[in-house]
Amino acid sequence: MASMIALLTWALALLPALASAQTQKGFWDYFSQSSGDKGKAEQVQRQKLAWEPTSLKDSLEQDLSNIDKFLEKLGPLSGQAREPPALPQDPADMRRQLQEELVEVRARLEPYMAEAHEQVGWNLESLRRQLKPYTAELMEQVALRVQELQEQLRVVGEGTKAQLLGGVDEARGLLRELQNLVAHHTGRVQALFHPYAQRLVSGIGRHVQELHRSVAPHAVASPARLSRCVQTLSRKLTLKAKALHARIQQNLDQLREELSAFAGARADGAVEGTSQDPQVLSQEVRQRLQAFRQDTFLQIADFTRAMDQETEEVQLQLAPPPPGHSAFAPEFLQADSGKALSKLQARLEDLWEDINYSLHDHGLGHQEEP
């Protein structure tokens, strides 16, 4: 019953939390119209806020009856049972009385909602902890491969320094060899990153499935919506992991092209008799490698932040926080009313699905007391 309590609390609290007074008014007008004068179809059409009225009207009376029965079961929460109050026929009085009743009901139900939010959040934090070693391993590999490349592409040594400062043919030969080394070693590093990227992808799939099993007892969402949310999370994180791997490969391609072009330009300069400074060559290689390292680290950090954002969004979808929580409906408090309304509609559609599941499929009369 705790999941149904959380659903009801969220439903009752959502409208007062909205920044848009017009959105609140539209919902109440639609509620009043649906339960009062159902003959004015054209007025309902203007006030429905893009919801399909047919499906709502077909199930409204039965759902309200079920909710009345459910409210009767809330009596033990306050230590005494009471009959649900009769709703007045006047829409304004109905709205006022409902709001007064809901303030009291919400205060009693919020603890259950907060508990579900915390339990789901704990499981999502566990997912983030489980995936952290994969990204840490990627960063370690980037640092290690950069260090290896720096050693393998070193052009200043006991033998190479004399070649660069010697004749044209010796300098050009060394620079052409550097181009070949760049192509060989960057290609080898690209191959080495494949298994690490694959481990990240497979780890996402495995740990998200574990999340599905662990979060199911605490989520207020219906099983079908829970499954969709988890599958969407898995798909998004997998796509982001593959995109990260592709960017690392692109970074290595760019590194190879830049170093090869630099060595080629130096080789052409040697043909023209330009003096080649070994220190300049070594410094260029170091700078390019450090730029690759820094860019790749930033991209891995971006992936980690995106993972955090996606899991936080899933937490809001599966177990919204209580209305007093700072994270409650933050996206509605924005200037873009069209975007806010779209998010509100999606959130209410999810809520309606969950309530229908709890009232009909789950069986209201068979719920256990919290």
From Swiss-Prot:
Single GO molecular function: phospholipid binding
Protein name: Apolipoprotein A-V
GO terms for biological process, alphabetical: acylglycerol homeostasis; cholesterol efflux; cholesterol metabolic process; lipoprotein metabolic process; phospholipid efflux
Pfam families named in the record: Apolipoprotein
Intrachain S-S bonds: none
Keywords on record: Chylomicron, Endosome, Golgi apparatus, HDL, Lipid transport, Phosphoprotein, Secreted, Signal, Transport, VLDL
Signal peptide, first to last residue: 1-21
First-listed, main subcellular location of the protein, grouped into a coarse class: secreted
UniProt record similarity statement: Belongs to the apolipoprotein A1/A4/E family.
Residues the record lists as Phosphoserine modifications: S59
Subunit and partners: Interacts with GPIHBP1. Interacts with SORL1; this interaction leads to APOA5 internalization and sorting either to lysosomes and degradation, or to the trans-Golgi network.
GO cellular component: chylomicron; early endosome; extracellular vesicle; Golgi apparatus; high-density lipoprotein particle; late endosome; very-low-density lipoprotein particle
Gene this chain is encoded by: APOA5
UniProt-annotated location(s): Secreted; Early endosome; Late endosome; Golgi apparatus, trans-Golgi network
Function: Minor apolipoprotein mainly associated with HDL and to a lesser extent with VLDL. May also be associated with chylomicrons. Important determinant of plasma triglyceride (TG) levels by both being a potent stimulator of apo-CII lipoprotein lipase (LPL) TG hydrolysis and an inhibitor of the hepatic VLDL-TG production rate (without affecting the VLDL-apoB production rate). Activates poorly lecithin:cholesterol acyltransferase (LCAT) and does not enhance efflux of cholesterol from macrophages. Binds heparin.
